[in-house]
Amino acid sequence: MLIYQTDQDWKYSLGRIFQPFYWKLRGDLVAPMLIGTLSVLYFTIALVLIIRLFRLQNKLQIAFLCALLAVNITITSTFATDIHEGDTYMLALLCATLSVAAFRKAHLILGGVFICLCLGLYQAYLQVAVGLLLLLFMQDLLDGENFKKVFFFGLKSIAMLLGGSVAYTLIMRFILHVKNITLTNNYNGLADVGDYSTTSIPNLIVKTYQYIITEWLHPQTFRSGFVGLANAGIILLTILLFVLLLVTKVESNSSRVLLLILFLLFPFGINIVYFVSKGMEHTLMTFSFGLLYLLFVLLLHYFPLSKIQKYLPYAAYA
């Protein structure tokens, strides 16, 4: 019988090289109360960072966002099936959020360190960092930030993501060499990552978009039809708000083009793991899909009709 909590070699072979080190600090005992407490702590800090990153002030919108992220199907599935790793996954979420917070403070090296830690804990949460960065750049453009400045920020963020990924890869290779362990190419394995020799990249890009849209409209939840309908309403409102803001709020054509590109890249960015893994993705890996609600809240914040604005969260929830 495979016991995940103590089979450290298996974790190393999956590339989750920092999980065994974290367990040494936390202890190998699977105590639900301890794991639950740590998970809530990490998750709460991540939410607070997100709220501060995007300067959210409206209490209703904050409650709306936090509630939807807290009941994310990934969170529910994690603690229903993999509670022994729940705090590890939430720490990966926190590291992804901290990387973006560090980037916002112009600490690129520190941001890269957190990207490295995130990948070494659970690679799937990398797309949370990607999604938050895309949303930050969209917010900057809506706030009237200069096109060149935002574009330069984008290049710096790519450098941070690549730097953290390279550092993770080098550390992983070193640890695997020392422990004489090879990367697995089985379930959740990394051995084939980056090998697209037998894959149609255009087709994979289309499938990456299709997968996330399917998960939004047909989520794997209780009352899937109701939740899918609510998500469809939020998506339609988000597109409507985006088009209105693109036309009325952004003055520079170059900024409009960049904002549109970021908006179109957003679904791909928060599902980048699907593309990298060539379709190997499941519910425990899709927390980032909930960033749709953050995008909705951000656009709602800029909506000029303030009298209608306060009723939109109720309409979306209904």
Question: Residue ranges of each PLM-predicted region?
Answer:
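Membrane-interface alpha helices of multi-pass inner-membrane proteins
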Residues: 108-123, 128, 134
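Short hydrophobic/aromatic helix or loop-helix immediately within or flanking a transmembrane segment
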Residues: 9-33, 37, 41
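Membrane-interface transmembrane helices that cradle and orient dolichyl/undecaprenyl
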Residues: 96-110, 140-145
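Perimembrane helix-loop-helix junctions
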Residues: 129-162
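Membrane-interface micro-motifs in multi-pass membrane enzymes
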Residues: 12, 16, 39, 60-104, ...
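Hydrophobic, aromatic-rich transmembrane alpha-helices
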Residues: 48, 213, 218-257
